[in-house]
């Protein structure tokens, strides 16, 4: 697909190529890839929720709700939106990264935010535009915390790195 982010098709193609050695069909390979993305998106939501609440039970419940949301189910099983299904892995990482930066934890901010944003852009660029607009509004609402030297410096560094890592696309 011309002008479409490459990560889903590339990763799915490599998985299919690998599983072809075990006589697994292309259709089954795509289903396995959907399962993997579904499972990892639940794990990422669990991580994000756990870092917010510090309670395993609430983190588990939120990841189950995240996986069972009608939008998530509709994207995978009704629309077969391949790239958007992969995006569900990266959205919790972006949110977690910003939360960690607001708390001054740069150790978690950089990997979460950068991996989340780069993965999001390379999986579904259009949805990441909407995510960026939403985060911009949230950051304007939280302007007292956001417009500080401790936030702006690392945030700009991370944004520049995201742009450099996704510049090829």
Which residues does each predicted region cover?
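Membrane-embedded transmembrane-helix bundle of lipid-linked glycan/lipid transferases
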Residues: 1-169
């Amino acid at each position: 697909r011309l002008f479409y982010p490459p990560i889903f098709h590339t990763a799915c193609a490599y998985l299919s190529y690998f599983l072809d050695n075990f006589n697994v069909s292309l259709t089954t390979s795509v289903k396995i890839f959907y399962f993997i993305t579904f499972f990892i998106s639940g794990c990422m939501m669990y991580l994000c929720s756990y870092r917010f609440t510090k309670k395993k039970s609430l983190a588990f419940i939120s990841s189950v709700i995240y996986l069972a949301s009608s939008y998530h189910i509709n994207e995978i099983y009704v629309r077969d939106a391949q790239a958007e299904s992969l995006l569900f892995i990266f959205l919790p990482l972006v949110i977690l990264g910003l939360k960690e930066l607001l708390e001054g934890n740069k150790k978690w901010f950089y990997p979460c935010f950068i991996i989340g944003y780069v993965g999001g852009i390379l999986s579904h660029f259009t949805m990441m535009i909407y995510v960026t607009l939403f985060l911009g509004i949230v950051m304007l609402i939280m302007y007292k915390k956001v417009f500080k030297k401790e936030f702006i410096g690392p945030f700009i560094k991370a944004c520049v790195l995201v742009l450099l890592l996704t510049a090829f696309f």
